Amino acid sequence: MEQTVHVPLGARAYDVVIGPDLVAQAGQRIAPLLRRKTVAVLTDETVAALHLEALRAGLAADGIEMEALALPPGEATKGWPQFTRAVEWLLDKKVERGDIVIAFGGGVIGDLAGFAAAVLRRGVRFVQIPTSLLAQVDSSVGGKTGINAPQGKNLIGAFHQPSLVLADTAVLGTLTERDFLAGYGEVVKYGLLGDAAFFDWLEENAPAMAAGDMALRVEAVARSVQMKADIVARDETEQGDRALLNLGHTFCHALEAATGYSDRLLHGEGVAIGCALAFELSARLGLCSQEDPSRVRAHLKAMGMKTDLSDIPGDLPPAQELLDLMAQDKKVVDGQLRFILARGIGAAFVTADVPSEKVLEVLQEALAHTQPA
């Protein structure tokens, strides 16, 4: 059932191994990378309570000792205070340049631990063991690491590729339904941006996958990772094609900022809503048929996901304010907002040529549905 996706980046190439029970095999998988039989693990309190002893046992099976620091769970951890704490802890533990740091958690831990590894002693190697669906299909692959600033998400960071990624699909069984579906937002994104056949496959198989079918989970993660690996190999530092991976993210980042990066909206939920809005905008601009956004929404709804602004609890700011938040996005070039739009399902492209009044129209219409009648 296990699948391996190779990320071909020359001297920085690595494998992403996908399958059940990889945490139990962590020792034998990581041992070839080690110069001495000890590792430092960064995790969060939720993951630690559920899985840290299993990781300790998996490492001990190969005679590897581990020390672990568990940070508070949640997006708020991804800032200077906890980052400083993590780096100083790694220094206290005398992590050397030849050692390995393990990122054991979801996207927040992966981003923070990867960035800590990137700056520690000017760069130590790290291994990703992503525990959420979102991290397995997205943030653990591709080497983007970083933390948030008061001015916006992911504005402080570095490109630092992992040495190995172990995506244990059995661990996904401990996710809440909400977290699993939030991660699924990123899975759908891959079908929407470049693989119509994968989107067809998801329409047919995703309900059974969400219900727990392990072979389908491995397949969905592997296909997502393969697609990301192909794009990252073509464009590691996001000069061109890699921007396609941001489908739905320009809307998403504005919505996350508007909701204060809180639990009102999880990142993957924002991506799903953002993808629906990006297709809506594409149809509005005459790039794709109106059937495409309808099909996107129908699938997200069938999966029980957030699809509209009205699905976000609480009040949202007016359309112009959301548009202003979009301008804070990292994808701004020469003051122009870059959007990822679509000529159809599986046919996304990057453009800066989007009239802001059209974006405003789509936002105003989406917000109109949130007002109580």
Curated annotation (Swiss-Prot):
Enzyme class of the recorded protein, top EC level: lyase
UniProt keyword annotation of Lyase present: yes
Cellular component GO terms held in the UniProt record: cytoplasm
Residue stretches in coiled coil: none
Ribonucleoprotein is among the record's keywords: no
Keyword annotations: Amino-acid biosynthesis, Aromatic amino acid biosynthesis, Cobalt, Cytoplasm, Lyase, Metal-binding, NAD, Nucleotide-binding, Zinc
Short name of any one Pfam family annotated for the protein: DHQ_synthase
Positions contributing to Zn(2+) binding: E186, H249, H267
Disulfide bonds: none
Pathway linked to the protein: Metabolic intermediate biosynthesis; chorismate biosynthesis; chorismate from D-erythrose 4-phosphate and phosphoenolpyruvate: step 2/7
Binding locations of NAD(+): G107, V108, I109, G110, D111, T131, S132, K144, K153
Gene Ontology MF annotations: 3-dehydroquinate synthase activity; metal ion binding; nucleotide binding
Cofactors demanded by this protein: Co(2+); Zn(2+); NAD(+)
Domain of life, per lineage: Bacteria
GO biological process annotation, one example: chorismate biosynthetic process
Cofactor binding comment, as recorded: Binds 1 divalent metal cation per subunit. Can use either Co(2+) or Zn(2+).
UniProt-listed HAMAP family: DHQ_synthase (MF_00110)
Entry similarity comment: Belongs to the sugar phosphate cyclases superfamily. Dehydroquinate synthase family.
NCBIfam families: aroB (TIGR01357)
Name listed for the protein in its UniProt record: 3-dehydroquinate synthase
Taxonomic lineage from the root: Bacteria, Pseudomonadati, Pseudomonadota, Alphaproteobacteria, Rhodobacterales
